[in-house]
Every structure is written in structure tokens, then in C-alpha cells.
Amino acid sequence: LATVINSLAVQDVLEQTGQKAKVLTSFPMGPVAEPYSRDAAEAYLKEGTVVIFAGGTGNPYFSTDTAAVLRAAEIGADMILLAKNIDGVYSADPKKDPNAVKFDRITYAKVLADSLQVMDLPATALAKENHIPVMIFALADPQNIQRVVTGERTGTIVEEEE
């Protein structure tokens, strides 16, 4: 339910800037959000609406990160915008290591090799396998949503080798 609430907040921020947005959930939410279907997501995207996926996959044992990557792969997304409680990917946990360095860009191979736990392993592997870059940015700053949607760089981009 928390992802649905967060998704509705993101939708509100986008709509305040004039960007149409639609929340699609893995389970019925009445008038609040529409149940996910690939066809509906693709139709919204074709009309220029930002689609926000919420509620995971609707199946146990799958994280919301894995759900985001799965949905992105299903619709052929160019990039995943992943708002987190951290502002990007670091060489170590910045809360524990004051020398941790934030990456502007990092490869999936390095994330996996160094066990950088920015997304869970299945999500990272699925994004890598489907060649989908992921922009990880801080949800704490509401302006970040507008920044990333308008193409401004913030956070870290996780991608394949260049």
C-alpha cells in the first residue's frame, strides 16, 4: 500500500507541472488507480502520459524493485526512474563510511561485483539482461521527480558497459 501512496504523490507532482500521469497497480484500488495491464500502459505512453507502476507484482517474494524492472521490460521502457531513500549509488554505505564516493554512472557489472545493494539482485540482473538503464535518485526532494522527467541528471545511472 505504501508504494501506491508514494505513486499517487508522484502523480500529483507531475500533474502540477502539466504532465499527464497515471498510476497502474497490481491489484484493484477502486477509483484511486487502475489495475495494471500491458495494453493500458502502452496506450497511456503513446498518448504522452507518464505511467507509474505501484503495488509490486501482486505476487509474494518479489521486491518492488524487481516489479519495476519487470514492468519496464514488459513495455519496452527506455529507462527506469527509481526513487529511493538515498540520492544515488555509493562505493559503500554513506551512513557507515564517511569516505563513501557517490557515482554519477556505474555499470551493472560493478554493482554486482562489488555487491552494492542499491537494488536487489534479481532486479539488477533483470535490468542488465533487458538492457534497461536505471536512474536512481532521492525521493526526499520532491523537485527531483520533475528534474528526472524533464531530462535533468540527478542521482546515479546504472547501465551496461559503454
Task: Locate predicted features.
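C-terminal catalytic "cap/lid" subdomain
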Residues: 1-162
